[in-house]
C-alpha cells in the first residue's frame, strides 16, 4: 500500500505575490519526500483553466509550467492521477501523451453504483442501509450524480427532522422527487462531454441502458445506448 496525497488545486493559489508558486513547489516537495506515493490532483481544471489569461499576472501559467516540468523530469516514484469535471478547460499541453499515460472517462453512476452510493451516505449519517429500499431508490435516480444522491440523503434527513420522525423510505422518495438531477440540468454539456470522451478517452465502465435513448459509439467498436 502506498500513501495517497490529495492536492486541491483551488487551495494552491494565494493572495500574496509568489505564494501560489511557493505552494505548488512545497506540494511537490512533500510528494517526493514520502515517495513512492500516489499524488491525486483533485479538480485540476480549477487551477489550470486560466493559463492563457492575463488577469492573474501570469500566476496560473507559472504554476502550470512548474507542474509540467516536474511531470516531465521527475525522478521520484510518484504516481500522478488527476480528476477534472470539465476536461475541455484544460490546456492541450497537459493532455498530450507523455504527461498522463491514459485518460479515462467516468460517466454518471449505473444502477448498482447508485445503490452503493446510497449505502455509503446512509452509513455516514449512522443509518442502517438494510432498513431502506435501496434498490427502488436506485431505480428512481437514473441520471443522478453521486453528489445528487448525497444531497437527496441530506435533504431527506432535514425533512425527517422537521417532521419530528426517524428517517424513512418516504422521506427519501420525497427528496428524490424534489431533486432535479445533473442529467437534466446539464443535458447538453453532458452530451458534449460524452462525445469528447468517446473519441479521446478510455471508457472506465460500460454504462447501463438507462439515460436518454441516445446512442454513441465507443472505441472498442460497440454501441452503447444512453
Residue ranges, per PLM feature:
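C-terminal engagement/docking regions of AAA+ P-loop ATPases
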Residues: 136-152, 163-226
Amino acid at each position: 500500500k502506498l500513501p495517497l496525497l490529495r492536492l486541491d488545486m483551488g487551495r494552491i493559489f494565494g493572495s500574496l505575490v509568489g505564494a501560489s508558486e511557493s505552494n505548488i513547489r512545497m506540494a511537490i516537495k512533500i510528494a517526493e519526500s514520502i515517495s513512492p506515493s500516489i499524488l491525486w490532483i483533485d479538480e485540476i481544471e480549477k487551477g489550470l483553466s486560466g493559463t492563457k489569461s492575463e488577469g492573474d499576472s501570469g500566476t496560473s501559467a507559472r504554476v502550470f509550467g512548474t507542474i509540467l516540468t516536474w511531470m516531465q523530469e521527475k525522478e521520484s516514484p510518484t504516481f500522478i492521477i488527476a480528476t477534472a469535471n470539465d476536461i475541455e478547460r484544460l490546456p492541450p499541453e497537459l493532455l498530450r501523451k507523455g504527461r498522463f499515460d491514459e485518460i479515462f472517462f467516468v460517466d454518471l453512476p449505473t444502477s448498482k453504483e447508485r445503490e452503493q452510493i446510497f449505502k455509503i451516505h446512509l452509513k455516514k449519517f449512522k443509518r442502517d442501509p438494510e432498513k431502506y429500499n435501496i434498490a427502488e431508490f436506485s431505480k428512481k435516480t437514473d441520471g443522478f450524480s453521486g453528489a445528487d444522491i448525497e444531497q437527496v440523503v441530506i435533504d431527506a434527513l432535514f425533512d425527517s427532522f422537521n417532521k419530528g420522525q426517524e428517517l424513512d423510505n418516504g422521506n427519501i422518495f420525497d427528496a428524490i422527487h424534489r431533486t432535479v438531477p445533473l442529467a437534466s440540468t446539464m443535458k447538453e454539456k453532458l452530451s458534449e462531454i460524452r462525445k469528447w470522451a468517446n473519441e479521446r478517452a478510455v471508457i472506465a465502465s460500460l454504462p447501463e441502458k438507462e439515460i436518454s435513448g441516445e446512442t454513441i459509439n465507443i472505441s472498442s467498436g460497440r454501441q452503447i445506448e444512453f
